[in-house]
């Protein structure tokens, strides 16, 4: 009986999901010109009256129409975006979007593997292009993302994916671009007040650090030796030691960051990014000196300590920017898949607390592309991918972020989603908005 019930339930859910899926956009066949909009290039510059033309998925011109004559007849489609804002597609960093659909169902959680060391665990093939959450994220300007693993000590490898595709092969922008590791926390709970328990915590942290060092030493020796015996975990680490992969270390405390800097030097790791870094405001110059980039997690969060300034999380991006640290934003934490849509508003809060506006745009676009080494994205300049969107107002402000057009590699994206459809459905039912 139970088997029959579950079989019927799976069939019903499959049919329901089939009807609810959005069809990916077709490859660009017509040349398109966005005319008259205020263009945020993604490099800190703005063109108040711009023309952006793209063909075959590539930008062919990006100019100021006050100083350049544009032949609009060259284009198959001309879209007047006067009075609107044009941005490069925002990039969701350190995201688990597409790796989990229903939090209460363990079988849908594809972002975590069992065990401590899983560098060969790939998010690439687990990415679900049919997630019902993805369209809700796209409609706020998040068009591509770094899909990252969680759990263990070495969690696995992340990949960069498009948020409109038929399958993971179709979605991939850059496969297996980095390895994620969780640095141990030297954390003692407030209710632990005897020295024996404190020493136990410190001993556990030291043991984990030793495990990390041992694993990296074995991996480095494996790479140098070129063993005939294939070890998949060690093979996944190979590109890290030759500078082809980036190491993302998840950590928040000053002590952790200092330990990570020493670790970077010890193993001669060329590319390293700290994810989280809540206490980075204490040592921004040290981070910059060691050429470490940062993914700032959840600007909308409380400070770590009672004595901290209440708004220090909001100020952190500005502090890092002044120190010359390359940084970007993520929304790691509770309900992070659906919360990815709010990443632009984290940047907006940072602007209100001292970060220059165009630096905030860079932290959502070109900074991300630089860290991920996807040079085709993050800028609206000639030769780059036509991954961009048009907003009726400021895209970093909740009340004015209203996307009218979006393109991924020149393909015009469907911006509707199930939540918006339900909103309009019930507004219409109760006469809250006029019928269109």
Task: Place the predicted regions along the sequence by residue.
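Extracellular/periplasmic ectodomains of large secreted or surface enzymes and adhesion receptors
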Residues: 29, 405-436
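Acidic, glycine-enriched loop/beta-strand segments at the rims
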Residues: 22-26, 39-51, 64-68, 338, ...
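Polyanionic/metal-chelating signatures
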Residues: 138-271
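His/Asp/Glu-enriched, well-ordered alpha-helical/loop segment
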Residues: 102-103, 108-120, 246, 288, ...
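Bacterial Sec-dependent N-terminal signal peptides
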Residues: 1-25
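Active-site core of metal-dependent hydrolases
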Residues: 49, 222-312, 370, 392, ...
């Amino acid at each position: 009986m139970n088997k029959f019930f579950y079989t019927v339930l799976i069939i019903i859910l499959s049919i329901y999901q089939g009807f609810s899926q959005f069809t990916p956009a077709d490859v660009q066949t017509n040349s398109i010109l966005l005319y008259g909009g205020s263009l945020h290039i993604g490099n800190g510059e703005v063109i108040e009256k711009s023309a952006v033309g793209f063909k075959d998925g590539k930008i062919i011109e990006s100019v100021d129409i006050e100083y350049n004559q544009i032949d609009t007849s060259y284009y198959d489609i001309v879209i007047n975006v006067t009075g609107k804002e044009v941005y490069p597609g925002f990039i969701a960093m350190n995201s688990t979007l597409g790796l989990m659909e229903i939090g209460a169902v363990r079988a849908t959680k594809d972002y975590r593997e069992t065990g401590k060391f899983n560098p060969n665990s790939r998010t690439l093939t687990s990415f679900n292009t049919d997630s019902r959450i993805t369209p809700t994220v796209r409609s706020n300007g998040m068009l591509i993302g770094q899909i990252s693993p969680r759990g263990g000590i070495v969690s696995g490898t992340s990949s960069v994916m498009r948020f409109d595709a038929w399958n993971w092969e179709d979605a991939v922008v850059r496969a297996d671009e980095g390895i994620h590791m969780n640095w141990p926390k030297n954390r003692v709970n407030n209710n632990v007040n005897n020295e024996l328990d404190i020493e136990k915590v410190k001993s556990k942290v030291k043991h984990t650090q030793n495990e990390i060092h041992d694993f990296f030493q074995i991996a480095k020796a494996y790479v140098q030796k070129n063993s005939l015996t294939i070890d998949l975990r060690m093979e996944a680490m190979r590109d890290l030691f030759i500078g082809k992969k980036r190491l993302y270390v998840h950590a928040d405390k000053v002590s952790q960051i200092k330990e990570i800097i020493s670790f970077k030097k010890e193993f001669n790791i060329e590319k390293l990014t700290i994810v989280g870094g809540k206490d980075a405001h204490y040592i921004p110059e040290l981070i910059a000196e060691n050429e470490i980039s940062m993914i700032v997690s959840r600007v909308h969060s409380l400070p770590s300590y009672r004595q901290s300034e209440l708004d220090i999380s909001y100020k952190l991006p500005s502090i890092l920017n002044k120190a010359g640290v390359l940084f970007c934003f993520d929304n790691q934490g509770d309900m992070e898949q659906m919360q990815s849509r709010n990443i632009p508003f984290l940047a907006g809060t940072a602007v209100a607390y001292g970060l220059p506006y165009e630096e905030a745009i860079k932290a959502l676009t070109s900074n991300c592309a630089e860290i991920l080494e996807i040079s085709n994205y993050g800028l609206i300049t000639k030769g780059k991918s036509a991954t961009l969107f048009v907003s009726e107002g400021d895209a970093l402000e909740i009340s004015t972020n209203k996307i009218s057009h979006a393109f991924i590699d020149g393909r015009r994206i469907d911006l509707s989603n199930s939540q918006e459809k339900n909103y309009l459905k019930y507004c219409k039912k109760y006469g809250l908005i006029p019928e269109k």
